Structure formats: C-alpha cells, structure tokens
C-alpha cells in the first residue's frame, strides 16, 4: 500500500478513534495531514509527531492526499469530503483503515457495548508486560503510555471494535472479545435488538478457523448468542461454567482482589491471585478477558499479575484528579472523571465508587450524551440517577443530533423530581458546571463528573479554579506579594 498511498488525510483527526490510527500511520512512515474544528491534546500530540493539523474544514485541505479517512461522525456534505469526491480521492471509513492496519499484524479486537476501552487497555498492558510489544489503538489515553496508540514491534495489534455503526464487521481479527451486548446505538439497527445481536454473531464469523472468541458469559445476551458462534470459544466471568473465572472478589482500598481459576485446552492452569489497580466488579470482568487472552498466548503468569497490579488506568475511565479543596477552604473532596454515558455502565461505575469509598456522600455531575440515547433509555436514566446522594444535571450534549421533545436535561430533571428520590440541580450551561460542583461539594464527598461530551473538560477546570484561589490566598497572606 505504501508505494501507492503516501499522503493520508483525516477529517476530524482529533477524534479518539481517528487520532490513534493517525499516530500509528505516522510511525509507519506515512505523511499524515488532518483537520478538526479545534485544537486538543490529541491534535497537539500528532503535530509534535510530525502531522500537519489544520483548524476547520476546507476543500484545499485535501490537496495532495492519496486517501481521505472519515469517521461516521463526518457528514457527507463536509467540504473536504465533497472535494475528495470531486478529485476522485478514495474516501476510507475509519474502520476500513483500522482493518488495513490489522492486515499487517494479527488482530485482537475488543467489542461490546460497555468496557471496550478499559479491556483493550488491559489486554495491551498485559501483553506488553509479557514481552509481546503489541501495537494498540485505543479510544482513550492509556496513562502508562501517555497516548491512545503505539506502534509495537510484536506480532499483535490490539484495538477496539465499534458496534455503534456496525463498522466492526469490517475487521478480520484472530482473537475477538465480546464484553457484553446492550441496547445502545439502536438507530443503526432499526431499533431491533435482534439485529444488534445478529451483528455480534456475524462479528464472530469474521474469525479464521484458528481464531478464538473470548466471551463474557455473565452477560445474558452474550450467553444467548453462544450457540451460534461457530469458532472456538473461551468463556470468562464469574459464572460457574466460565473457563477463566473470578472467585472471592472483593474491594480493598480502591482496588479489586480476586482469585482466577483457569480451565483451558482441556487442563487446569495454576490459580492466579490478582490485585487489580481498578475498582469495581465490572473491571474484574474486563481483567478476566485480558487474562484469558494472555493465557492463550502463553504470557507468563508473573507478567499477568504484575501488569494488573501496576495498571495505571485510562483517561476518563474512573480517572482520579485527587483531593480538591472545598469552596470554603475548610475541607477536601475526591474528584473523579468518567466517560460513562449509558445507564448500565453508569450503574457499574457508581457501584465501583460506593465500593471504593464506603460511607461517603456521592455527588454526580452528569451530562447526557445524545438526544436519541436520552429518549431510548429515559426510564433507566431516572433509575440510575436516583441512586446518588446529590445530582448536578447538565443539558444533553447533542453530538450533532437535533433536539427531541421530552428527551433533554430539563425533562430528566422534572422526571427525577416527580420520582421523589432526589432533588437534582439543573445546570443549563456546561460552562457553569465547575462552579456548581464547588457550590455543592462538602468535606469528604466523592464527586464524579460523567458523560461522553464536553463535561470531560470540567474536572480540570475545577482543579484550576481552586488552584487560582489558593494562589490568591498566598498573595494575601504575604501582604500582597507572592512568596
């Protein structure tokens, strides 16, 4: 491919899925250009690595490109897409470009409605500790690597497989993981859950005869498709019939401790005593997927144990910002940020927080993501949002969707008040959320910002605002001059 295609342009290069692929292509020696509406940490990193990143979208940005990569978030009337069509420059969906990268190595694809990013990160970390030096493309920043992508020298590439637009059906990996199957992105599947499950079955059919499907049998929908998977299967979870099974799991000081029983290839492997540097039973399941793959690839047990104990997490996945002073300066609260935006994953994260911080007041600042999801999961949102001790509710982050009547932040607020479980505070402008958090937070609270939209910028703004207050106080204490 390289002798024909040398210059690759990304429309929306700062996106989580796009930036990782762009970084790997840069490291492979391609010339990469891209455009995005604004600057971000991802675009700054790509620029430092040698990419040319332009702000805004304009037809001239595609001049000289041999291929133009787009995600499903890019509309067909985008001026760069229109210019590429006019010039007969191939327009390549993001998933197709990822599939091309997988052709260069042996692919490990992580699919599922929830937990893809964390599971992908755990798999990459365990394989790296085992000396396999994988390439990875992740939808979040792997803290230990300081990036969401890396070109390794080993045989494997580990990547997320996105079911939201059915693009995971473009991939042909040798190992697949399905963490769970839930009702999300239902517009893609005509609001037919059977079609969504069928897509996951078809995903397993992409495996070669020597491939492996690693399936979480704790999930009832994954268990339901099990009879239709024709390739070799490794079952993992807490269930008694799991081949890679966790027992005696418990939360200890914000981590999870558990024992892993493995029955693979007709014989029992030695039990593993695991300390996972993440909270929550859902993360135990995610770790089991990584353990199953690592065991199949003969990663030494000591490397598995070490990687999970030292795992430093992923950006915006239960990311701890530390202890922040309260507005009155008389106390401190724990600030955590999480990408969760579906009721199921939100419930898992909140349960993990309760386990990690027992007895403490839990304050949630939540920004719903997409009007369609808010509409489709409205009652489930009401249930999960009613489980916290205090709630700050932002307006829906549209992600390009038009508003839907009775599926916005105000509608959720009204429904929560009618339910009577909690008295939410509606924060109409996300710019006001940092101050709303400081007004609400009390000493010893655990405050979680949650959502897939612009709320991800809020924790840093809270920390920065309190740092400015402390700096001003230092000036006052020193008679008007900073020490």
Curated annotation (Swiss-Prot):
It comes from the Bacteria. ATP binds at residues 112-118. Pfam families: Mur_ligase, Mur_ligase_C, Mur_ligase_M. The keyword Transferase does not apply. Its main location: cytoplasm. The keyword Magnesium does not apply. One of its GO terms (cellular component) is cytoplasm. It is an enzyme of class 6 (ligase). Pathway: Cell wall biogenesis; peptidoglycan biosynthesis. InterPro entries: Mur-like_cat_sf, Mur_ligase_C, Mur_ligase_C_dom_sf, Mur_ligase_cen, Mur_ligase_N, MurCDEF_pg_biosynth, UDP-N-AcMur_Ala_ligase_MurC. Its EC number is 6.3.2.8. It is found in: Cytoplasm. One of its GO terms (biological process) is regulation of cell shape. Keywords: ATP-binding, Cell cycle, Cell division, Cell shape, Cell wall biogenesis/degradation, Cytoplasm, Ligase, Nucleotide-binding, Peptidoglycan synthesis. GO terms for molecular function: ATP binding; UDP-N-acetylmuramate-L-alanine ligase activity. It catalyses: UDP-N-acetyl-alpha-D-muramate + L-alanine + ATP = UDP-N-acetyl-alpha-D-muramoyl-L-alanine + ADP + phosphate + H(+). Belongs to the MurCDEF family. Cell wall formation. NCBIfam families: murC. This is UDP-N-acetylmuramate--L-alanine ligase. It comes from Ralstonia nicotianae (strain ATCC BAA-1114 / GMI1000).
